[in-house]
Each structure stands twice: as structure tokens, then as C-alpha cells.
From Swiss-Prot:
GO cellular component: alpha DNA polymerase:primase complex; chromatin; cytosol; nuclear envelope; nuclear matrix; nucleolus; nucleoplasm; nucleus
Compositionally biased residues, Basic and acidic residues: 265-274, 285-297
Residue(s) carrying Phosphothreonine: T180
Keyword Zinc-finger: yes
Annotated function: Catalytic subunit of the DNA polymerase alpha complex (also known as the alpha DNA polymerase-primase complex) which plays an essential role in the initiation of DNA synthesis. During the S phase of the cell cycle, the DNA polymerase alpha complex (composed of a catalytic subunit POLA1, a regulatory subunit POLA2 and two primase subunits PRIM1 and PRIM2) is recruited to DNA at the replicative forks via direct interactions with MCM10 and WDHD1. The primase subunit of the polymerase alpha complex initiates DNA synthesis by oligomerising short RNA primers on both leading and lagging strands.
Protein name: DNA polymerase alpha catalytic subunit
SMART domains: POLBc
Amino acid sequence: MAPMHEEDCKLEASAVSDSGSFAASRARREKKSKKGRQEALERLKKAKAGEKYKYEVEDLTSVYEEVDEEQYSKLVQARQDDDWIVDDDGIGYVEDGREIFDDDLEDDALDTCGKGSDGKAHRKDRKDVKKPSVTKPNNIKAMFIASAGKKTTDKAVDLSKDDLLGDILQDLNTETAQITPPPVLIPKKKRSTGALLNPFSVHTPKAIPSGKPASPVLRNEPLLTPIPLKRAELAGELAQPECPEDEQELGVMEFEDGDFDESMDTEKVDEKPVTAKTWDQETEPVERVEHEADPERGTTSYLENFLPDVSCWDIDQDDESIPQEVQVDSSNLPLVKGADDEQVFQFYWLDAYEDPYNQPGVVFLFGKVWIESVKTHVSCCVMVKNIERTLYFLPREMKFDLNTGKETAIPVTMKDVYEEFDSKISAKYKIMKFKSKIVEKNYAFEIPDVPEKSEYLEVRYSAEVPQLPQNLKGETFSHVFGTNTSSLELFLMNRKIKGPCWLEVKNPQLLNQPISWCKFEVMALKPDLVNVIKDVSPPPLVVMSFSMKTMQNVQNHQHEIIAMAALVHHSFALDKAPPEPPFQTHFCVVSKPKDCIFPCDFKEVISKKNMKVEIAATERTLIGFFLAKVHKIDPDILVGHNICSFELEVLLQRINECKVPYWSKIGRLRRSNMPKLGSRSGFGERNATCGRMICDVEISAKELIHCKSYHLSELVQQILKTERIVIPTENIRNMYSESSYLLYLLEHIWKDARFILQIMCELNVLPLALQITNIAGNIMSRTLMGGRSERNEFLLLHAFYENNYIVPDKQIFRKPQQKLGDEDEEIDGDTNKYKKGRKKATYAGGLVLDPKVGFYDKFILLLDFNSLYPSIIQEFNICFTTVQRVTSEVQKATEDEEQEQIPELPDPNLEMGILPREIRKLVERRKQVKQLMKQQDLNPDLVLQYDIRQKALKLTANSMYGCLGFSYSRFYAKPLAALVTYKGREILMHTKDMVQKMNLEVIYGDTDSIMINTNSTNLEEVFKLGNKVKSEVNKLYKLLEIDIDAVFKSLLLLKKKKYAALVVEPTSDGNYITKQELKGLDIVRRDWCDLAKDTGNFVIGQILSDQSRDTIVENIQKRLIEIGENVLNGSVPVSQFEINKALTKDPQDYPDRKSLPHVHVALWINSQGGRKVKAGDTVSYVICQDGSNLTATQRAYAPEQLQKLDNLAIDTQYYLAQQIHPVVARICEPIDGIDAVLIALWLGLDSTQFRVHQYHKDEENDALLGGPAQLTDEEKYKDCEKFKCLCPSCGTENIYDNVFEGSGLDMEPSLYRCSNVDCKVSPLTFMVQLSNKLIMDIRRCIKKYYDGWLICEEPTCCSRLRRLPLHFSRNGPLCPVCMKAVLRPEYSDKSLYTQLCFYRYIFDADCALEKLTEHEKDKLKKQFFPLRVLQDYRKVKNIAEQFLSWSGYSEVNLSKLFANYAGKS
């Protein structure tokens, strides 16, 4: 029986009966009779009257209920589970479930167990413990009690600070005392997070051995460093042996408040995580919970369909693979002997971080250090201090008078430069201390008037002094280089550190205060103390893959985190094959929305299944638990999907919103102020995790593979070849109705984390990123973010530093360029930015030969130059250091930019330049690695390592050319890029001429490849011919090589960059097989629905087959009729109708959002919560009939909406007419017997709407919905000739295609400034010249129209003539040459009208302003559009409008149209 005390107190029976529990009456422990309100008042009345009150002792029946131990434990448990304070979520008030007499039991236990303290101390402790933190009841009883005398109240406690303890309580670094089976005696006092008191733990109490202390989990090796006692010792107790993690979780709330009185700074003992035996290999497979449908619940039938067949929790786990806990003494550095026998600190650096504003001149290096005593690696942080700014002053030849702006005749010496810096510059910029010396440096970049080799004054001073202006000039010096070079760059370059590697720190210093969350912290007082250790393999890393589920709060529309799951591998090797399985431990934590409750049996279900699930009462508790686990596990790499642009941002925002302490545990650097979140580059989110690298598999997949979208479901299907079920966001709330549903939700999150980890392993993301980083010499965390431009930049930086060159300073671009400074990938994502950049870098690209369109059924040879542009750079020694660029004066004198000045090729006798040398190194190293791969009996791990290395070398070498032509690159050199492409065009034309001289027909060529029609059906002869051409071409070059890329058995060549072919693949037995290859066709683009793609694939397969023409036409006809019927009767799955289109910018940044279907749907998705789509993401949508008369573009819906809304149905006519018909019609153009009318008839469409004609829309217009009337302005005028006008001041050609440049806050009028950054003259100052140029362009277009050239629609004919033929067909004049097809105008009336509309559009400022938001409109009007500027715009617009008024194209004369009908009436 449980012990029951006979207290000398009187309890009212009614109080017991009302509450059903003694707990209801124990808020105040007053020894007063409570037999009834009336009797109490009567006694009070008598007492006031002066009557003597006699105490009567009555024989009372026992008010205690006698129960056995098991019943009492259940009662205590039930009270703990009860949320007895409404909406309190257990924070601040905690019900521990015990009776009022349990405190006395605990007092006795404390008296008997306490050691080293006298009784007084215990009594004092007991007094503190017995103060329950409860609120005063608002009733008459409270008034009576208050009247008896003033009670001493508890000191007010700041709950936000108390919640800080909740985070620490979750930190599993702290050992707990041994606990025994129930009854659980817990001190009754205020808790920080009462939610964790609920025993929704993964294990049941019977799993804990009763009465026996748990064996400590330690490695077999003895610990050489003494283990300091834990914080529990401060409370006067001996540290207990370590408990397994399972037991720690059960006892997670068993700490005293005193355990946390010690400062965090003194916590120097950390351990590696011990994984609980969540998957017990000795346990039989857990039986799944069966789910029965409840017809009364609307969502049950839907949820039932997604219940898992196999539970992911039933996986066995090998205990031997799980790392054991280790303890380290951070004050005792693991030093080893260096090369010169001195004690050094050796570590493998992984990530680096600098804070130039708060800690200038300091670089933090994060990595792993080997602990010999326990044979493992743990995290460390090395703080490198005193990295000085390094500037180079270029002296003038003659002194310069800054006042007059003229050069004097006084020669300049280096002493003069020094004195000017010492007396003027240092005083002005408060540089109190500096060092200087004379050095000789080389320069080879784009600033004119800088000599190739010269003496410079090198000046070094503390980085704590602000940097000097980038454009600083003086009387004795003309340029200053290195003003804005970062401390991190200086450190990496000067110490020759190329990517993650082993480093040694001489004379390492301990830090007084902890600066990081790492196990060891070291300080290097100067960068020279850090040196590279070569040729040592990397250590294994701790990798954590996590996934989380969010819900949108319906009130504030913020994303709230409800569950998280993580998988961890504690020894993930970077130089071997991925481990199998790719994780060793896992954990899962779940909370609930504020308006939901957990299922009543949820705790029992997870206990029964023996799962490791932590239940958190609030989101704050959940996040605190996650941060504590991250701190405990200490991962080196966090892996996720869409983690950079959504999950990490949401996590940090919720940390901020919930005021969770120690937010910086998400990274490794201790910080108090969270960086600014929400920037488009994700800069703040990346900085928050410094020290822990972020691997976003979405970013990695975009670089390594091609998919129609990069959503997790698509990646799982493409890479892992399995299906991922998606839980709609709106169904998550309903999953809290039953344990089985909630369990499935957690399993879904767990599986997502596993999918993410598997994708990372399948793509070899980490080993590849490491190899690329070691080649380029940048930072691995940036490589994982996909910055190709930055990789090239660092590779060249290392090369030029090593060769004593001054490198270009980083340019701070104004407006959109600032955003591109960190993220070069946006070149692909934002077309507007890309176009703006290219205005300053316009040069001719690769040559594309005109295709001889048609179907070829003889063998076609495809010859391809290997790595054309890198090979050209090597072949002709094209480099910054070898090519003499034309002077700026010559460039300004060039009026026609299209006839750009191509620099001369360098002298063949010149020494090889740095750029070709670096490319050659990469090529040669790749060849060596490929040779090593051919060795016999290689270890599979070594083969994989070699393969990853050669792939990294190839990726790096092929991207080297890009830095020359990318206008935001630090090494941007337009003349060099133009020279490379010029030589590429020249080589392709020369190769074409050579092949034609061999009496062979070249039918197509594109940049680095040509197609040759062999007119042969003998494969052996074809290869002989190919080898002959190959040898003839290769004779001309030393390094350039052309090779046979493919042989096509048949080829359907439609237009430039568009063809389909059957590729021949020889087999070992002398025969061959064929494989279909598609290039540029609609069916390989993602903005066509799968139904159209599948139909197009079938048609192509038929055309390329060996069947007769009649059979092909018949098969196509049958298939199209079948498809038309299936679409109309609704037997086609909805997924076949989904159209995918990529966002080129964030959805909210589009000015005309309604007319763009993917933008409209993206905004809806973002409003729903669960995920966030942004620039670069792909949006799926379907076109539906919704009962409205809106255009197709405005009837686009997300697939989820189609499933939910009953009034939506697939728009079958749209898909047949606008998706399937155009795709099939384009493919069948060269095929006799099939035309657009027949295709329409077969699909069940109205054939009168179609006529035989050539589709001349560009590939971008192909994907648009509903025709020209529904196009946006950008898409409507995409093919128009851009308006160009030379700047009278600088001669730069300005290109205008819109009223505004830039977007968002960076928007400004296109006429506001010249595209030449150095030109200060605005185009608004020469409006007369601009108007005259516009009139001349319009007249030229009109003349072109009236020239009246006609061309034949037949692709194989293409005749061009001006004389109108006499023979006409129903569709127009017949071509007199081929007599098959009709003639069409080369420059149609529609083209002329569209061009005139475009000229009006680019100067219609009033219309453009109306499309903006009110805020943007007011800002632009105030800043850029005074009345005078608006009038200038209107004048130019009126010119185009005047010419348009003369055109009759847009007008319909109704009187003429209905003249016949009017006469009849």
C-alpha cells in the first residue's frame, strides 16, 4: 500500500466530492475546518461577538483513500498529464501529480540521503522546495485566508529567463542521477517547461533496471585527461555514473534549479552523443497499428489512403556502429610534435567565418581535431587574430595638382609617396600605426595606365582602422589596390590554404572566455603561426540530415514548426563510398498547433512501438529541444532540402519569435545578436550557421543533374527511383485527431530526412564539393551553395598571388549588381539582371550554322570539339598577361559595337600565360586521374574517389572561360572573351569548309560541333569517314581536338538547336543498338504538360522508325484519335495535365502577376504555408474551367486546388488545342500527308480554326497560353528589334527595351543614365537626337515592309522573291519553285505593327507607372519623374503613336465587313 499520513487537518467532504481529487483542495495547506460555508460564518460571527470558542475533537472517518502502488502511480501520472492551467502550455505552472503529504516524504528522503550538510541546511532547502508557485484563487475562501495574516510571497520570477532553463534542461550533456521505478517523487516547485514532465517518452519505466546503477558508457581506452566533476556536485551531491541516453530522457526533468546556477562559460566537459537503442535488434518487429475508417470524419477516408505499409521505425540498428560518449578537457589542448619538434595544435579546417564590422582582422576557423586518448575527432575553433590590411600604392611619374587637375613637372620618388601617406592619408583616416616597404609587383588587368611591372609602396596597418576609399588618389600616387580585400582572403592567399586541409597552429593560446560551441578553442595571435600540412586524408565528419513540417498560423499567417526529424551519421567519410546505411542514429520531436491537442493514446502508441519521439507542449519547447540536440550531436554538416531559402529562415524566425535562448547553437560561433533575416541572397541565414556547413540537395541537384523541377518529390523519383507521398498542408491539422494519423505524419517527416540523405549520398555531393574546393581554393560552405563564379575567382586569385600579381579589387556594383555580388547563380534566375549585365558585355557568341531542315534516313555523323573554349585558350595562349587589349580611346571611337575591336592574338613565342597554364594543369590532372582509374584490381572506394576527382576537375576546367565574359566577375575581361568566341566561330567555319572540300555535306553546326550527311547505310564506312575527317582537322592544331561524338541512324532536323535522332551504339558482337535523343524540342522542355510530351515522343518514335510512310501516318492518326477521346471522357490522370514553369524572379516582384499563370499559382502556394516558392523554383499548375469567362492564363490553378474545389474541371479544349496540337504540328512539318488541319480533326477539334502554315513563334512563345492577346508586354515584344542609340558624350551604345531598368527598390527610368558607368551624361539631355534616331528606325522598318519580299513556307525550298505569282491556293499564293507550299511575307504587317507598338511601349511612362504599386509609383514620380521628364517621354512616345495612327492593321472597318448584309436587309 502507498503510505498515507493522518494529518491533523479537517477536510470538507463536499470539497472532495466536487473535485474528485484531493489535489483540488491543496493549493493552501491551512489547518482549518472546512465543513461548510454557513458553519464557518457562524463561528466567525460568534468570535467577533466575544464568545469563547472551544476546540472540539471529533472522531472522523478517514478522508484518505487506500490504493495499491500501481493504482497510485497511475493516478500521479494522470495528474501530470492534465493541463490544469488553461492555455498555459505547462510553462510557468506545473502539476506534479502528488498528494500534499508527498513533500514530507521527500523531506525525509533528503534528511536521510544528504551528505556533507547539517540538518539546518536541509530544513532550509525543504522550506524552499515546499513553496508551490500557484496563483491565488479568486474566491471568498482566499479572502478569508488573506484576513488571517499576511503571507510571505515568492519573489517574482521572469518566465522568459526561466524558459532559458528549458533549453538547458534539454541539453543532454548533463548527467542525471539514477532514477527508480514509480512512484516518482519530484520536488514540487515551479518548472521552466512543464510540458517535458509529461512522460511521452519513447521508453516505458520497465525498461529501466530497478535498484541497480546503470553502467557508464565509455570507450575501452583509458581516459588520459582527468574528467572534471559535473555541475551536480555543486549542489552537494556526488556525480552518479553515466546513464544511457534512454534513461537520461526519462529523467530529463529531474534536475534541481541549483544545477544550473553555474555559468555556461565553465561548462568544459562535452561528450559525443550516445544513441539510444531505438531500433532494438533483439525486439521482434513491432506490429503496425491498424486504422479503421470513421465515416463521421470527413478527412478519414483521405488520410487512410496514405497510411504507410511498412514502418520506418522497425529498422534494426547495429550498436557497434554507434559512437560512444567521450569526455574531453578543453583546458588541456591535444598538442602534438610538429616538423621542428615544437608543440603544435593540428586540426582539419572545414569552414571559415569573419565579421568585418564587429571583429575586423579576425578569422574564425572551424574543424576537427584528433584526440589520441579516446581515438576520435571532436570539433574545434581556431581564432586567428591580427590580420592586417595590405595596400599597394602605385606612384605617379610626376606630381599631380589635385586642385587644378593637372600634372606638374616635379618627378615623384617613393619617399614622396611615403611622406604623403604619413602626413596626409594616415592623419585623415586616423591610422596611428602602420608598416611600409617598397615591393615590385605585376599587373595584367583592365585598369588602363597601370604598368605591367612596377614598384609599389606596400602599406600594412591594423584592420580595426576603417578601410580607405577604393578610388583614393593623391598627388604622388595614381591608384591604391587592396583597399577592400577581406581578412579571410588575405589569410587564405598568404598562407596558401586551398580548401579544407590539415593545418598546424604554432604557439596556440587558450581563450579566457568561450567564443564558440566547439569542444576545443584555440587562438593564434598572428596568421603566420598557421601552416598547411599536406597529403593527409580528411577525418570523418558528423552529418545530420533533418526535415521539418510547418503550419501557417491562420491569425498572423506566420509559419510555425510542429515537428522535426533528424538522422545522424557520426563518422561520414569524405574519401570513401557513402556509408550504408547512411545514418546511425535519429531523433524526432513533435509539438502541436495552439488550437489542437494530442490524441489521448498517443503516448501509449509510441511507447508500445518503442519509438524515440519527444513530445513538446509548445513550439518553443520543440525548438529548444532541437537546438540542444544540435549542440549535443555537434554536426559538421546540416543536410536538407530547400533549407537555404525556406527551412533555415523559418527556423531562425521562429527562434526569434519564441525567444528561444542560445539561438547560435544552430552554428558553432557563440553570438547574441541574430543576423538580419529574409534577404534574397540568404546571407543572414548562412552566417547564422557558420561553422556548420549547409548542404542543400536542391542547390546541389541543380548543378549536377537536369530535372523538370527540383522539388523533393521529383528528386526522389529521378534519383532514388521511388515515390514520395505528399501530405497536403491543409490535412496536417486533421492528423492530430488520431494517433495513427499523427504517427504517420512523423514517419513522413522521418522519411523525408532519409530521402534527403540518400539523395546527397547518391549524387556524392560532399566528396565532390570537397574536391572542387581543394582545386579552386575557396571555402567549402560556399561551394555547397553553388557559386561557380566564386570558385573560378579563387582559383585565379591563388594563381596570380603565387606569381606576384596585384589582383583586381572586388567591385561593388550599384543597384541589381549588389545582389549578384554574393550569388552569381542569379544570372540564370533573373533574366532582367542578366540582360542588364550583358548590355556592357555584348560580344558575339558561338556560331550556329543554318540547318538544312528535313528528315534524313541515312547515317549522320556528329563531330564535336573537346572542350572548345578551354582548348582555344590553351591553343592560342589567351590570357590577361599575354593579350594586348585595345585602349579605351579606340573603344570609344568605335561607333558600331557589333563590329567590335577584337584584340590581336598573342605572339606564339610568348611564355604561357597564367590562365592557360591553370587550365592545362586541370586537364593534365584529369588525364592522370583517368589513367589511375584504368588500373587493375582497384579498391572500389579508390575508384569512386578517382571518379569524383576527375568530375570535379572537368567541372572546374569547363567553367573557367565563364569568368571572362561574366560582367559581375572579378576577372571580367570582355576583350578576352570576345577573342575566344571569335576564334571559336573561325574554327567552326574553317572546319565546315574543309569538310565540304572533301565532297561531304554539312547539314548543321552549332558552336563546337558539325553534322555531316554521309549518304551511307554502312556503319563501318561511316566510322572510317569520321576518322578521316577527324585526322584532317586535328592536323591543324596542337591542342584542339575534334572527335566523333555520335552517329545518327536517322535524324529529324526541324530548326536551329531543335532535332530528334536515333543514336547508334555499337555492341561487342559487331552489331549496334539505337537510342532516341532529343535536342531543344518542346517535349524536352518542362513548360509543356506530360500528355503533350508523351504524345510528341510517340510521334517522333514513329517518324524515326523503319516503317513505311503510310504506316507511320496511320499509327499517328490512331494515337491522336485515342488521345482526343481519352481527354474528353476524363480518363487521363490529372498529373498528365500539369504544366511546369520556372520563376525568373520572386513571385511578388512580377508587375503583371494575373496574366502569368505560374506567378499567380506561386502566390497562392506562398499564401497557404508549408513551403515557399522563390526565384529559380518551378511551379506546377493546370488550366481549368471554373465557370468564368477569364482567359486561360487567369484560369490556372495548383493541382491541389483542382482536387479540393468541386467547381473546377480540366479545360480539355485548351489542352487539345494549345498543348497537344502545336507540339504534334511542329514535329510533323517535314512529313508528307500530315498537316495542322488533319491533326485537329484527329484530336476532335474544329478544323476550321487551323490552316496549313509554318509555326514561326520562338521557343519561349511556344509555351504561352491562348495566343498573342494573352501575352505580357515582355513576351509580346520579345522578338522585336531593340531600340539602340549612341551616347553623344561617350559613344556607348545604349539599348532600350523597357521604360524602367531594375526592379523593386532599384527601379529607375531607362533614360536616367548612360549604360557606361563612367559616363555622367544622362540620355534625357539629348532627347532631340534620340527622337531623330527613333524616326529613322521606324522609317527603315516601314521600308522593309514595303520591299515586299516573300519566302516559301516549305522548309526544304525556302525560295525568296518579290514578284507575286499567278497561282493561288486557298491558303495563299503558291510558290512557283516547288509548287507545294504557299509564300508568306518575310516581314509581315503584323511584324511591322508589333515593332511600332514596341517603340511606343518603351517610352510610354504613364502606362508603365500605372502598372506599379502605389508605393513604387509615388517613389519613382518623386525621385525620377518631374513634369519635365514626363513630358520628354510623352514627346518621344507620340512619335511612335503618330506612325501607328497611319497604320490600318489594328482597325476593322465594320461598314465594309457587313456591307453585304446591310444591302440584303
